[in-house]
Amino acid sequence: TYLGRDFLKCCGHDQKWQGMTEVFEKLKAYNEKKLGESGIDTLVTSCAECFRTFAMDYELEDMKVMHTTEYLIENGFEMDLAVSEDVTVTYDDPCRLGRQMNIYDEPRALVKAVDGVDLVEMEHTGEDALCCGVSSMMSCNENSRALRLQRFDEVKATGPEIMLTRCPKCVSHFEGLQFEGEP
């Protein structure tokens, strides 16, 4: 069953990590009620932060919470995809998906399944992956910028044409470098 994009409200990840407990609890109560009424037994989400929040901070009795990459691998999804020209990519392990939820292999398996894609690893991967520097969008300052630049130096040293990640915060934070005149 596909519940649709508007079925739930925000998972409340940022509110929780910003200390907005009352707002988080309201979002959580609303979503738990909607999910409980839905009759589904598995909740699949593509957002690393939603995955972590639903799996660890919600009480979803008898409901399995999975990341999209886990679900696809576990259910034997056949990619049968190819790129028009060979491409080299690297994969950035998001903090929430990797270190907090131990999802490292599934995203890589899906990337490797695409014909013509060569996955190269950065110096720091898996549990040792460097953070993009953002935490609930609260710390976009010079310190977080230094973390972004350090991680992007690793990307450049690896030599890929594309960097992939499964976290919307990482994407927006890395894209911010373009507006600052960086890579």
Residue ranges of model-derived segments:
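Iron-sulfur cluster-binding electron-transfer modules in prokaryotic oxidoreductases
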Residues: 1-183
